[in-house]
Regions:
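Primarily short, surface-exposed interaction patches in extracytoplasmic proteins
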Residues: 35-60, 65, 69, 78-84, ...
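Non-catalytic C-terminal accessory modules of carbohydrate-active enzymes
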Residues: 73, 224-343
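Proline-rich low-complexity regions
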Residues: 54, 80, 175-178, 281
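A glycine-rich phosphate-binding loop feature that marks nucleotide/adenosyl-phosphate handling sites
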Residues: 79-81, 132-138, 277-284
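Structured loops at beta-to-helix junctions and adjacent beta-edge loops in soluble globular domains
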Residues: 81, 156, 176-178, 305, ...
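Carboxylate/His-rich catalytic cores and anion/metal-binding grooves
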Residues: 1
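Active-site core of glycosidic bond-cleaving carbohydrate-active enzymes
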Residues: 9, 13-45, 50, 101-273, ...
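Acidic/histidine-rich catalytic neighborhood
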Residues: 58-118
């Protein structure tokens, strides 16, 4: 368990002792998931075995012990915890702690999925994998509210800030990938409605939150809106050195959200396919990129004119199948390690 401000000096309590600012217990798990992402980009099995798996194993087994059954449904939920950093109204009062908030459930689902994926790749099947798989099947997952939005909590609760800067409950769409247009289009619609609702209710933007929203819009295939948000971030939050201001100081999340969004406008690889120019903004009608990495250990150079691809060069670092998708058409390449392919 680690709050989002836990650091090398063992600062452990919720930020300023406010539950809605720091009582979220899956933040360390979010960081752990980067181990599996590193493997997906490199296919480095030695890294997977010696670095990623030990971390994923400990994290997954912790949550197997942490989860408890929801007495209403029997499904497993995390808690008590808060959905960073939103609050809700109940019985005329403001509260923040609950059981099974969407943010926690999505990150725990990803943790279980990544651990089981790593074990499958390494040929591991034992009591621990069986236990984790059983818990994963019993997880309570978010549902859609009566107004069509993705629910932030297990009940339909009225948030205190409709335009709250955090979009924690949309984690499963971005940076997670449980929610995709290919497999869960109904949830994608709910994510879009949730995001539109926030943006249309006097959205309380910070530099880092604008970065997250910019990336979310790119993944939602809304390129022009993503670019508008990116430019708004630059003109209102950027410092002269390109750091992004948040509460009078730069934060690392501020600087990473926008570059990620720029990449996702041009290339996305979080599904079974590698999508080329999936969210290209109208203003970027002509362009060229080199050295873009994709999951599966592929490196892309691309050029486009008038919004259309005119050349694509793919270098395969490890070999294997490469599934490309462009304008709804799918092309499968069988590649060899170290070779390049020009389309």
């Amino acid at each position: 368990v680690a709050g989002h401000r836990t650091d090398a000096w063992f600062y452990a309590p919720p930020t300023f002792l406010k539950a809605h600012w720091g009582m979220s217990i899956t933040n360390a798990a979010w960081l752990c998931l980067h181990h599996m992402e590193h493997y997906r980009y490199t296919l480095d099995k030695e890294f997977l075995k010696t670095r990623a798996l030990p971390v994923l194993r400990e994290t997954a087994l912790f949550f197997v012990d942490w989860l408890v059954p929801d007495p209403r449904s029997g499904k497993l939920v995390s808690g008590p915890t808060a959905s960073p950093e939103n609050r809700f109204k109940v019985n005329g009062k403001v509260a923040s702690l609950t059981m099974g908030c969407t943010y926690d459930q999505e990150i725990i689902w990803n943790t279980f999925r990544d651990f089981l994926e790593a074990c499958k790749i390494l040929g591991i099947n034992n009591e621990e994998t069986v236990e984790v798989e059983a818990s994963m099947k019993k997880l309570s997952m978010p549902t859609i509210a009566n107004d069509g939005r993705l629910m932030e909590w297990t009940k339909e609760l009225e948030e205190t800030e409709p335009g709250h800067r955090h979009i924690s409950h949309l984690w499963g769409m971005m940076p997670g990938n449980r929610i995709t247009q290919d497999k869960t289009p109904h949830l994608v619609d709910a994510v879009r409605k949730s995001l539109d609702y926030r943006l249309n209710h006097n959205y309380h933007a910070q530099g880092w939150s604008l970065g997250w929203v910019t990336s979310m819009l790119a993944r939602l295939k809304e390129g022009d809106k993503s670019l508008d948000m990116m430019q708004h971030n630059y003109f209102t939050k950027a410092c002269p050195n390109m750091f992004v201001d948040a509460h009078g100081r730069p934060q690392v999340g501020d600087m990473m959200g926008v570059p990620l969004a720029m990449i996702e406008l041009i290339l996305q690889s979080h599904t079974d396919y590698i999508d080329l120019l999936p969210s290209l903004p109208t203003a970027w009608k002509d362009g060229k990129v080199t050295g873009l990495c994709a999951r599966g250990a592929f490196v892309f150079d691309m050029e486009w004119k008038a919004g259309k691809l005119i050349s694509t060069n793919i270098k395969s670092l490890k070999g294997g199948k490469c599934l490309l998708r462009y304008e709804g058409k799918v092309k499968e390449l069988s590649t060899e390690a170290g070779k390049s392919y020009c389309l």
